[in-house]
Amino acid sequence: MWKGPSRTNQNYQIKYAVSDGWGDPIQINRRPTSKMSFSNYEKEQLKESIGILTIAFTLALSNGLIPVMNEPSILLTELPLAFAAVMTGFLLHELAHKWMAQQYGCWAEYRGNKNGLYFALMMSVFGFLLAAPGAVMVSGNISNRQHGIIAAVGPLTNIAIAIV
């Protein structure tokens, strides 16, 4: 899959680019590594997803926008709960996928899905939530078994959190 370093520079490039869900191609300029690393773009995507999901969860926990407008003090209790839910249920889930993929030497980065995030925000206004915030994009030469393990580790993380 790797072209190797070019003669003009020593950056490694992959043969193809994958869509990031926002309409931009993802440029890969380094070899995959088992060390957990984050690009600046990935950090921005995670921050935006966490922010929008926190607002959406806050509204859903408050039974929609109307109760929040009638009693803004609801936010004092619901916002911290929503943030904790997003950090444990969403962020740890996505980081588990990323960590496992990188353990297999794959390139792995989270990409947000604007449509899924805005849909979640729109639905939360009415007091319920359906979220498809994004996914960890994985690229590398792995077996079907390894791919299955990468896919399973996110939900297993959520199950472990629920047990605790």
Task: Locate predicted features.
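Hydrophobic transmembrane alpha-helices and their immediate loop junctions
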Residues: 1-164
